[in-house]
Swiss-Prot record:
Job description of the protein: DNA-dependent ATPase and 5'-3' DNA helicase required for the maintenance of mitochondrial (kinetoplast) genome stability. Essential for replication of kinetoplast maxicircles, but not minicircles.
Protein name stated in the entry: ATP-dependent DNA helicase PIF2
Coiled-coil residue windows: none
Enzyme class (EC, first level): isomerase
Name of the coding gene: PIF2
SUPFAM superfamilies: P-loop containing nucleoside triphosphate hydrolases (SSF52540)
Region (Disordered): 187-206, 1012-1048
Positions that bind ATP: G456, G457, A458, G459, T460, G461, K462, S463
CC cofactor: Mg(2+)
Compartments (UniProt record): Mitochondrion
Reactions accelerated catalytically: Couples ATP hydrolysis with the unwinding of duplex DNA at the replication fork by translocating in the 5'-3' direction. This creates two antiparallel DNA single strands (ssDNA). The leading ssDNA polymer is the template for DNA polymerase III holoenzyme which synthesizes a continuous strand; ATP + H2O = ADP + phosphate + H(+)
Keyword Membrane: no
Lineage: Eukaryota, Discoba, Euglenozoa, Kinetoplastea, Metakinetoplastina
Length: 1048
C-alpha cells in the first residue's frame, strides 16, 4: 500500500436529514480520497465515523495530526470519531446529540464492542476549516483524547512543543494519541500494512516518525512492559478501552514531517503483563494512564486517583504528584511563589475549605518572611515530614494496630471490644490467686460453661471478679466479648458498651448481627440498666446468627449487676424476663469489700439498699440543712465533689466554680486523628471492575469466592481445624467498595500465624492476578497497597465521626490555675482513673517536662502532634500542658492521651483516635454517672432538688469507702425507695455455696464440643513447635559432629 493510501472504514450508520445510509468497510486509494470527502461534505452530514481498520485486534492505534485550529466562521471539513473508546465529535452540538440519541436507542456499538459515548464538554466541532488544507491538499482532522471514558475537559492541555528548525509555520502542539483496543485477535504489524508483527522490535525507523513513537513509548515503559506479556504468560482479559497521552518533546522528533498529511501508524501492544513491583508501599499489577494512579493525599489523608478534584485543586500551590513515589510534592515552584506573593499582597484569600493542620502549617510557612528558595524548601520538607510520620507505622505486607490497642491473646476479635483500658495499676496485677474464697468459687463455677448471673450489692467486688473471669476464659483459648451497659463500667472492664459492640441503634435493633457469631462467651456488666426487650432481642439474634437452636445460640452469657441499684429508664426491668429466669444459674456475692473498714456504715447501706432508713444513719453520716450547706461549702467543704440530679446542674456548677477562679482561662480542644486499621492485616488488594457499572457485579458471589480462596490456604496451615468458611468470612475477610469502579480487599492475619505462613499467605494472595480473570468474577487485580492509610470510605468516616462526637473526651476542656480536676485514664501506679487533683500551673508541652512513663516513642509522637495542633490550628504561641497536684507529693505535667473509638466491622475495622488531655472538671457529677465508681475525697450529696427515685439514694451514698467523706443536704425519708419486685428477686438469690444447676440448663458449645475450643489447638501448636526445636537441635548436633569428623 502506498504512503498516500488512507484507511477508511465504516463504523455503522451516519445520519442525514432525510434518511440513513450504510457505508461498507473498504479501503479507498488516495485518488478517490478527495472525491469521497467532497461528496460527504456537500451533504447535510451530521456525523462521519473514521475508525481504525485494525480495531478488532489487540493493537494500539497511533494517530498523528498537525493542523491549525478551526477559525471562527469556517466550514468544518472533516469530523472524526475514535472507534476504540467511542469519543464522538459531530459537526454541531445538535447533530451530535441526535446521533447519540439514535445510537443509544438502537444499542449500536463500535467494532471494538465499546458502547458509543461522547464527552459532556467535547460537543463543539474539533475539525479544521476548509482553509486548513495540507500540502497534499487533503483536509485532515484532529483527535481529542479522552482518558477512560472521561471527557478531555478533565485532562490538562498539553504544552506547546518546540519543533525542529524549519520554515516558520503556525502549528499547534504535536500530540501522540495512543488508543488501546479492547478485543484480542490478530495483531497488526508495526506500520499498519503487511502481516501482523510484534511490538518489541519495530522496523528500522530511526529516522522516521514511527521510530520516534517507538522510542517515546519505550522510554515511558509502556512498550517494554507490554512486549514481555507472553513471556510471563499472564493476561488480565478484556477491559474497558483506555488512551494514553504521550507528549513528543522537541528533542525526540527525529525529523520534521515531509508534508502535513495525516499519517496512520499502528503499533501492536501485547496483553498487560503483571509486574512484580519492588516498591515498598505499593505494587502495581498493571500500567495505568496519566491521572489514574492511586495517590495518598496527605492533606485529606485519603487515597485518591491522581486526577481527582482534591489533587487538581493543589495545583494552585504548585503541589502535584511525584510519580516516582506516588506522593505529593512541589512540582511547580513558580506557581507556589506566585500564590505566595498574591496571598501576602492580599490579592487572594486562603480557601475556607483548607482547614486541616497541614494546611495551617503550610499557610504559616507561606506568610513567613523568608527567601524564595528557603520557602520552597520548607514546603517540600513539610510535606516529606508528614509522609514520614505516616510511614513510621507501616510494615511491609503486614498492617499492625496501634501500639496502645489492647488485643486479647488467642482472640481474633478481641481488639474490637477491648479498646480503652481503665483498670488501676494494682487491679491489672490481680489474678485468680488474689481473689477471696467466695470469688474463687464463682470463677470455678463459671468455667463449667453455664449461663450465669452474678448478683451482689455495691462494693462486693463484681467488676474485679469479671476481669479475672475474662482472663481465665481467654487463657483457655476462647473469644470473649467484654461489655457493659454504661461507658464508665465498660472502661473499668477494659471493654466496650453493649450498644457499641453489637451496633444497637436507638430503636434497640442489632445492626451488626454478624458480630454475634464471633464469640464463645459474652460478658455484660451493670445489667440492672439492661431492658427486658433488648436482652430478649440479644438472645434471638444469637440463636439466629449461630444457627443453633439452643439458648443464646450455644454462646455462654455471663451477667453481673445489682437490681437494687439504678435501672433502665422507661423500660421493663430484666427481672421480668422469662428468658433470664429460665436459662441462668443465679448466685449472689455476700462479702462487702469496699467498706470493710466501717462495718456499721456497710450495714446501714444494706438497709438503704432494701428501701429502709437506718435509725442511726445521722450518727454516721453528716446531715446539713440548706443554710448550713452554704456555710459548709464555703468553709470546710470547699472543693468537695457534688452529686446532683441532672447534667444541666452539673455543667452549671462546674462552670460556676471555674468562673470563680481569678486566673486566665485556657481551652484545650480534642484532636481527631485520621482513621487507622485495628489489628494485623495483609496488604490491601485493589480489585477493579471490568465493566464500568459495578452494579452488574455479583458482590455476594465475589465475596464467597474470595472466602473460599483464602480458606484453601488456611486449611493447609498447622491450625486448619480452627477455620471454616463461615468463620473465615466473618472474622478474616474484608471486601468493600472503595471507588466507583474498584473494591478493596484484605485478610486479617491470625494471632498465632508464623512469619513463614505470613509470607506464604502474601504469595497466595498474589495469585489473585491470574485467578480472578480465570473465574470470570468481573474484577481484576489492579494494585497492591501495603499501607491501609486513607483506604476508608466516606461511610466509615461518617460513622467514626459520630462515635467520636459522643465520646466524653471529645469536648473541649476548659481549665484555670486552681481548677479541681479528675483523671480520666491510668498514667502510673497511684495515678489512675478517678484520681482527684488541682491544677497548679502550666508548662511547655515538650518531652523534657513530661514524666518518665511518657518517654516512649508512641507517646512522644502523640505529644509532638498535639503540640503542633495547638500551635497551628488554635493559635497557641507556645503549646502548654497543665501541671496537676494529685496530693502526696505527686505533681506532674499531664500529657495528652489517645482514646480510640470504632474498630468494628461496620467501619471495615477502622478506628479513629481522639487525642486530648485526660482530665475533666471535678466539682460535680450526676448520680447515674458515678454508678460503678469509688470516689476519693469529700463528697457532698445535694438532695434539695432531687425527686424520689428507686435505689438512687443508695447508689449515691455507697460511692465512698468511709462515711466521714460524705455529707448530705436536705435529706428526707421519702427519698429512700426500693422496687418491690427487685427486692423479692434479690432475696431469692442463693449464696455461691448453694448455686443450683437445673436439669434443663445447657452448657455452652465451647464446653460441650471440645473441638471448638482453642486450647487443644494451642497444645497442638506447642507440640509442633517443640518437635521442630528438637529436630533443629538434632540437625545442629549432626552438623557439629560431621564438622569435627571432617577436621584432620
Amino acid at each position: 500500500m502506498s504512503s498516500k493510501t488512507v484507511v477508511w472504514s465504516s463504523l455503522g450508520r451516519f445520519m442525514r436529514t432525510s434518511h440513513h445510509r450504510l457505508l461498507d468497510e473498504k479501503l479507498f486509494p488516495a485518488s478517490h480520497n478527495r472525491h469521497v470527502q467532497s461528496r460527504l461534505l456537500s451533504t447535510p452530514l451530521s456525523l462521519i465515523a473514521v475508525p481504525s481498520w485494525m480495531s478488532k485486534c489487540r493493537t494500539s492505534a497511533v494517530r498523528l495530526s498537525r493542523h491549525p485550529p478551526q477559525v471562527s466562521g469556517q466550514e468544518p471539513c472533516a469530523v472524526t470519531a475514535s472507534s476504540s473508546v467511542g469519543t464522538w465529535h459531530g459537526s454541531s452540538p445538535a447533530g451530535l446529540r441526535r446521533c447519540q440519541h439514535v445510537r443509544s436507542l438502537n444499542g449500536w456499538t463500535t467494532p471494538g464492542d465499546v458502547p458509543i459515548r461522547h464527552g459532556s464538554r467535547s460537543i463543539a466541532t474539533i475539525a479544521t476549516g476548509c482553509g486548513g488544507v495540507g500540502a497534499g491538499g487533503i483536509n485532515s482532522s484532529v483527535d481529542v483524547a479522552e482518558v477512560s471514558g472521561v471527557s478531555t475537559s478533565g485532562v490538562a492541555a498539553a504544552p506547546t512543543v518546540a519543533l525542529p528548525p524549519g520554515p516558520p509555520v503556525e502549528k499547534p502542539p504535536l500530540i501522540c494519541v495512543v488508543r488501546r483496543a479492547t478485543r484480542g485477535g490478530a495483531a497488526a504489524d508495526s506500520v499498519g500494512t503487511g502481516t501482523p508483527g510484534k511490538c518489541d522490535k519495530p522496523p528500522d525507523s530511526s529516522n522516521t516518525l514511527v521510530g520516534t513513537i517507538a522510542r517515546v513509548l519505550s522510554s515511558s515503559g509502556e512498550c517494554g512492559r507490554h512486549s514481555n506479556a507472553n513471556q510471563e504468560g499472564y493476561s488480565l482479559g478484556s477491559r474497558p478501552a483506555r488512551k494514553i497521552l504521550v507528549k513528543l518533546e522537541a528533542d525526540t522528533v527525529a525529523a520534521p514531517l515531509a508534508d502535513t498529511k495525516e499519517k496512520q501508524i499502528y503499533v501492536q501492544q501485547q496483553p498487560v503483563v503483571v509486574a512484580q513491583s519492588p516498591l515498598a508501599r505499593s505494587s502495581s499489577t498493571v500500567t495505568w494512564e496519566e491521572g489514574d494512579t492511586l495517590v495518598y493525599n496527605i492533606f485529606t489523608q485519603r487515597v485518591v486517583k491522581s486526577s481527582s478534584a482534591s489533587i487538581r485543586a493543589l495545583s494552585v500551590l504548585g503541589v502535584g504528584v511525584r510519580s516516582s513515589e506516588k506522593e505529593l510534592s512541589v512540582v511547580d515552584p513558580h506557581a507556589l511563589v506566585e500564590f505566595r506573593d498574591k496571598l501576602r499582597e492580599k490579592e487572594v484569600s486562603w480557601p475556607s475549605a483548607w482547614r486541616s493542620s497541614l494546611f495551617n502549617q503550610l499557610q504559616h510557612v507561606l506568610l513567613k518572611d523568608q527567601p524564595m528558595e528557603e520557602m520552597i524548601s520548607r514546603v517540600h520538607e513539610l510535606l516529606q515530614l508528614h509522609y514520614q510520620r505516616v510511614k513510621r507505622s507501616c510494615v511491609a505486607n503486614v498492617t499492625k494496630g496501634e501500639p496502645d490497642t489492647k488485643t486479647e491473646e488467642a482472640n481474633p476479635a478481641g481488639d474490637e471490644v477491648a479498646i480503652n483500658g481503665e483498670m488501676t495499676y494494682h487491679e491489672r496485677l490481680l489474678g485468680y490467686p488474689d481473689l477471696n474464697e467466695e470469688q474463687r468459687r464463682v470463677v470455678d463455677f463459671v468455667l463449667r460453661g453455664y449461663n450465669t448471673y452474678i448478683g451482689g450489692g455495691a462494693g462486693t467486688g463484681k467488676s474485679l471478679l469479671l476481669r479475672v473471669i475474662r482472663q481465665e476464659l481467654v487463657s483457655r483459648g476462647l473469644t470473649v466479648a467484654t461489655t457493659a451497659t454504661t461507658g464508665i463500667a465498660a472502661r473499668r472492664l477494659n471493654g466496650a458498651t453493649l450498644h457499641h459492640c453489637f451496633g444497637v441503634n436507638v430503636y434497640g435493633e442489632f445492626t451488626r448481627r454478624a458480630e454475634l457469631k464471633e464469640f464463645d462467651v459474652i460478658i455484660i456488666d451493670e445489667v440492672s440498666m439492661l431492658s427486658k426487650e433488648l436482652f430478649e432481642s440479644l438472645e434471638f439474634q444469637l440463636r439466629r446468627a449461630n444457627g443453633v437452636d439452643l439458648p443464646f445460640g450455644g454462646v455462654q452469657v455471663i451477667l453481673s449487676g445489682d437490681f437494687l441499684q439504678l435501672g433502665a429508664i422507661c423500660s421493663v426491668s430484666l427481672v421480668h424476663s422469662s428468658v433470664f429466669r429460665r436459662n441462668f444459674a443465679m448466685l449472689k456475692l455476700q462479702r462487702v469489700v469496699r467498706q470493710e473498714g466501717s462495718s456499721i456504715f456497710a450495714q446501714q447501706l444494706q438497709e438503704l439498699r432494701r428501701g429502709t432508713v437506718p435509725h442511726d444513719l445521722q450518727d454516721t453520716v453528716q446531715f446539713l440543712s440548706p443554710p448550713e450547706t452554704a456555710k459548709w461549702l464555703e468553709g470546710e467543704g470547699k472543693g468537695a465533689v457534688k452529686l446532683l440530679p441532672t447534667n444541666k446542674e452539673v455543667d452549671e456548677v462546674n462552670q460556676a466554680e471555674l468562673d470563680k477562679l481569678p486566673s486566665d482561662l485556657v481551652v484545650y480542644p480534642a484532636q481527631m486523628q485520621a482513621p487507622s486499621l485495628v489489628g494485623r492485616w495483609t496488604a490491601t488488594y485493589i480489585l477493579e471492575a471490568v465493566v464500568k457499572d459495578t452494579k452488574m457485579i455479583d458482590t455476594h458471589k465475589l465475596t464467597r469466592a474470595l472466602e473460599q480462596y483464602v480458606l484453601d490456604f488456611l486449611q493447609k496451615t498447622p491450625y486448619a481445624s480452627d477455620y471454616t468458611l463461615p468463620v473465615v468470612g466473618q472474622r478474616y475477610i474484608v471486601l468493600y467498595k472503595l471507588f466507583v469502579d474498584a473494591f478493596a480487599f484484605r485478610v486479617r492475619i491470625p494471632q498465632d500465624m508464623s512469619e513463614k505462613d505470613m509470607r506464604d499467605l502474601a504469595l497466595h494472595l498474589r495469585g489473585l492476578e491470574t485467578w480472578l480473570p480465570a473465574c470470570g468474577l468481573g474484577v481484576f487485580l489492579r494494585e497492591i497497597l501495603d499501607s491501609p492509610d486513607g483506604l476508608h470510605t466516606d461511610a466509615d468516616d461518617y460513622t467514626l465521626t459520630r462515635y467520636a462526637e459522643l465520646h466524653p473526651m471529645a469536648s473541649p476542656l476548659r481549665l484555670k490555675k486552681g481548677a479541681k480536676v479528675m483523671l480520666r485514664t491510668n498514667l502510673a501506679p497511684g495515678l489512675v482513673n478517678g484520681s482527684l487533683g488541682v491544677v497548679v500551673g502550666f508548662k511547655e508541652l515538650s518531652a523534657k517536662h513530661l514524666p518518665r512513663f511518657v518517654n516512649t516513642p508512641g507517646r512522644i509522637a502523640a505529644v509532638e502532634n498535639y503540640a503542633e495542633y495547638l500551635r497551628y490550628e488554635h493559635g497557641f504561641t507556645t503549646a502548654f500542658a497543665p501541671e496537676v497536684d494529685f496530693g502526696g507529693g505527686r505533681v506532674i505535667v499531664v500529657p495528652p492521651v489517645l482514646f480510640s473509638v470504632g474498630g468494628l466491622s461496620n467501619t471495615n475495622h477502622y478506628h479513629v483516635g481522639i487525642v486530648s488531655l485526660p482530665l475533666s472538671l471535678a466539682y460535680a457529677f450526676t448520680v447515674h454517672k458515678v454508678q460503678g465508681l469509688t470516689l476519693a475525697g469529700r463528697v457532698h450529696l445535694e438532695l434539695s432538688r432531687m425527686w424520689p427515685c428507686d435505689h438512687l439514694l443508695y447508689v449515691a451514698m455507697s460511692r465512698v469507702r468511709n462515711p466521714e467523706q460524705l455529707t448530705v443536704s436536705s435529706f428526707h425519708n421519702s427519698l429512700v425507695r426500693c422496687a418491690s419486685e427487685c427486692l423479692l428477686f434479690d432475696d431469692s438469690l442463693p449464696p455461691v455455696e448453694q448455686v443450683r444447676v437445673l436439669p434443663h440448663f445447657f452448657q455452652a458449645s465451647w464446653q460441650r464440643t471440645p473441638s471448638r475450643r482453642k486450647a487443644a489447638l494451642q497444645r497442638k501448636r506447642e507440640q509442633a513447635k517443640q518437635s521442630k526445636q528438637k529436630k533443629a537441635a538434632k540437625l545442629k548436633e549432626a552438623m557439629i559432629k560431621q564438622a569435627k569428623e571432617a577436621t584432620p
